């Protein structure tokens, strides 16, 4: 079995900053003894390292706690220095329908563009953009994800030659952070402001008229460190410009530079293939208010959404040319989808998300305020239909996606929603129950999926059953089960728990019993051949669903 041996090459901090995760490309590396090993880059702009793929179980344990401690100190420092009344992530913001975005192309004194401005204008704005197998432009992506509610226009300027070398901006400090990427933004805006032919009016990019340019997006010449380029290259990310860390003018005609994001001109670390829209859309999604859904402090290596989501590794699907569409959760959060509350028993149908913009929401109490930015209850499940078409063509699989959200504003603000393995803020329920570390997604994650899982129990009382997919359409049944207490004298069932097994009493020949674990996954299905059923006792809480003719009952056991 292949495992990962961690080499801590360089590390850094991630506070509320957003960044695209490393592209998981495996490459050969020569060690000091001359041996060749396979390495894969992990992490993002704010903490990254190489892992060696080996056949042994070696691991390093000391560095993870150090990372967590550094990160916690950085968050405290960030909060102390933040004098803005508004948090940098505009939580739950619903963007304007025709918002304008500012994009600037910059070259370094020692590095020039191989592509021209029209290439980037097409990448961002051209309807039906298909260069290098692309599914569409950035404009197409956001238009489709918002169901036509958000159709941004990206104004592209440059390229401008900066006075400093690439290493000035991208060189890593001792903690692995790029030295001066924010200065690159200040220098780029200065070049644009000095270009009389451009005739830019920065007021066009202050949609909410708060005195700040809504966002400055930088495309820099060459490659990104996230795809294996040298450490002197800039790693794509999104953040803000602070006076104390930069030199030069920050305000023009009463409009100040504040939020920015950036990414590279080219894919990979060699060649001349132009970038796709994946990294741009990932970083611009931070501008809209979405956090990262991968593990941002690298104090853990548990599975997150991976290829299923653009705010995780999905930004790299089809080499960044076909990032997956926004999930129902992201659309709900941004105000682009209002899910239907599922509480009445019956049969239901789900059309594909990209076609229908439809999802169901399930809460423990059967009610919800339907405000994705400030959800109440803050814990809920969403059901959506994902098919391998359009923006989702490169997903690991297809079927019904069941996701769970535990919304915590502080975790979203600090960009740490999924860092706690035992309480992830947003994740999918793997239908096959398998969530191996290092997995970026698999066909068995959705329902019925390759494992043919057709039922699931939520909150130990809501049953989703008979899940079927026909021609890309999902059908299922939903019902709230009537719970039976085994202590009730009127109960016709009894449950005896012994050391190694348990026995269900009061059943009859032909009674069907389903057993689910504490999180709702089906463990087994048995048909009774007598008046009792003996089974191995599951670990922890479990739920028995008993179907005896037309009668359906539920028993909880421990």
Predicted segments, located by residue:
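Active-site recognition of the HExxH zinc-binding catalytic motif
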Residues: 218, 278-293, 383
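Glycine-centered tight-turn motifs at strand-turn-strand junctions
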Residues: 70-73, 498, 522-538, 549-551
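C-terminal tail/sorting-segment detector
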Residues: 484-487, 539-558
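Non-catalytic C-terminal accessory/binding modules of secreted extracellular proteins
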Residues: 31, 114-115, 122, 129-149, ...
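A domain-level signal for the mature, folded cores of soluble proteins
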Residues: 166-179, 183, 187, 268-275, ...
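Short, glycine-anchored, charge-dense loop/turn motifs used at functional sites
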Residues: 515-523, 542
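Residue-level detector of functionally pivotal "anchor" positions at catalytic/ligand-binding pockets or at interdomain
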Residues: 478-503
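Active-site-proximal segments of metallohydrolase catalytic domains
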Residues: 88-92, 137-253
